Amino acid sequence: MQWVIKLLGGGLQKVLGTSRTESLSATANIFVGQTEAPLVVRPFISKMTDSELFAVMCGGLASVAGSVLAGYASMGVKMEYLIAASFMAAPGGLLFAKLLVPETETPSYDENSADGDLDDKPANVIDAAAAGASAGLQLALNVGAMLLAFIGLIAMINGIFSGVGGWFGMPELSLELLLGWLFSPLAFLIGVPWSEAVVAGSFIGQKLVVNEFVAYLNFAPYLKDEVLINGVAMSDHTKAIISFALCGFANLSSVAILLGGLGSMAPNRRGTIAMA
């Protein structure tokens, strides 16, 4: 673990000025998901500073796993947009993390800050497989439970909105629709023409409330010009902006995944993770 941190994290530390552990986690997020990337710095999570822990969380939310890029591309999203967004997410996530939670402590990544013995190796292949399966199952159960709870909560909120909207002739009222209206100014600020801002804001809202996969799925017909906006196909400029904006795990469900994943790796930091 130590030599990997010195090799990869050290390079990013010099370029970005961040600690080696958070830099390595950000780099790993380019290739793997938000629950797998923190595993490369797992021995250090429990002793990370609040700023480092927040940077790890931001990196996971800002990026997507490399394994899902093909799925998004099959919906019609240009692969060059997805790859560019993934690589931009690593330094971008660290940048915003440090703006929101600046480092006020002294990060440490030596053996005294690690949770357990870094040199503790499995006795053989069977021991390694058993330990990996046990850790993986614990992580999956925690993530699954948190994800189920958050999705259920969102469904309950949408049910309430739909019922209230039905009283006023708007049974289609939902959290996603409200966020679409709410995020239309944001869509306009990032370059989407106002005539397309409400539609773009709706996709951003879907990404935030549900997940980016559902948002891309609903965005696909616009990419193929199967759905028109006021009788006109969505502009290529807007398609590119939305493709970048949706490429990330930042949504309410991912908060549950982070809480379950990082919480199982460092139970003593669960409160800090939830507050972040």
What is each of the regions a protein language model found here?
Residues 134-231:
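Transmembrane helical segments that form the transport core of multi-pass membrane transport proteins
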Residues 13-74, 200-276:
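Alpha-helical membrane segments and immediately flanking helix-loop junctions
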Residues 23-24, 118, 122, 126-130, ...:
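Alpha-helical membrane-protein architecture signal
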Residues 15, 48-51, 132, 136-147, ...:
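Loop-to-transmembrane-helix entry motif
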Residues 1-18:
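Hydrophobic alpha-helical hairpins/lids featuring a short glycine-rich hinge
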Residues 81-96, 240-248:
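Alpha-helical transmembrane segments
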Residues 62-71, 86-101, 146-159, 183-186, ...:
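Hydrophobic core segments of alpha-helical transmembrane domains in multi-pass membrane transport
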Residues 87-139:
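Long, contiguous bundles of hydrophobic transmembrane helices that form the permeation core
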